[in-house]
Amino acid sequence: MSLVEFVIDKLNDLKGTEIVHFDVKGKSSITENMIICTGTSSRQVSAMADNLIAECKKAGYETFGEEGRNTADWIVVDLGQTIVHIMQRDAREMYQLEKLWA
C-alpha cells in the first residue's frame, strides 16, 4: 500500500469526507502529493489528525510536523512526500485549495 492509499484509508476510518488527492509533482517544490479531507467539527478534525499521525508512526512513516492545532478548523500534517489538509467545511470552501492545485 502506498503512503497516499494509507493516508486515505486512515482518514476514511474516522469518517473523513470529500477526500481528494492531487499529484503535485512539478507544481510544488515541497511535496509530491496533496490530500484534502473534510471533517464536520473541530473535534473530528483534531481526531483525524491525531489518528493519522499515530497510525503513520506505527506503520513506520515519518511525520515532519503539523500546523493549525490551535483552531482546528484546518490542520496540515506534513508527511514529506505527502501533505494532508484536514479542514472543516467552512475553511475548505473559503480557501478552495482544489482550485489552486487542480
What are these regions (language model features)?
Residues 1-34, 38-102:
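Positively charged, small/polar-rich N-terminal and surface patches that mediate targeting and assembly
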